[in-house]
Amino acid sequence: MKKPFTVVQTVAKEMIDHNGHVHDANYNIVFSDAINQFNYQHGLSLQERKALNYTIFTVEEQTAYLSELIENDQFYISVYIYNYDVKRVHFFSIMKKQDGTTVATNEAMMLGISRATKKSAPFPQHFLDQIVSYYDNQERIDWPKQLGHRINISQ
């Protein structure tokens, strides 16, 4: 099994909010950037999107905040594929501190889009092949309870 696609970053001062930790919107930015980097390196670079008149949209996402990050903390995001079909990929990403503490998780559903029609369209074959290969060869994990979690207040 292959190690997951991973992006490493350090918390910059601009990411900090009035509570002294990373602002919630910045978690979503770094998760989105990690998935973009995954896509760029697996067959959907900006140049490939332009040449194919094709792109990929986020159609649903959810982030769970489990621990804090403060300025200068180093963290990494590991990207997993939970599921896919010919025009959708369900990503699950895990953000951890260098000591292994899980900081946040992010679940995102991405949908392939034809720029010509502005409608959903199957993935280009070379990208789908990369998704299938990644999924088949990724490290197997016990999916965290945050996967598929429904926001609710228990009564």
Question: Would you name each region that the model predicts?
Answer:
Residues 61-98:
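Hydrophobic beta-sheet segments that form the core/acyl-binding groove
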Residues 31, 93, 106:
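Conserved GNAT-family N-acetyltransferase fold
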Residues 97, 109-111, 115:
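Long amphipathic alpha-helical scaffold regions
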Residues 13, 92-94, 110:
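Generic short beta-strand
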Residues 5, 57-59, 75, 89, ...:
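Hydrophobic core residues within well-ordered beta-strands of beta-rich domains
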Residues 100-102:
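Residue-level signal for glycine
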Residues 1-58, 114-155:
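Hot-dog-fold acyl-thioester-processing enzymes
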Residues 106-108, 124:
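Short hydrophobic alpha-helix segments
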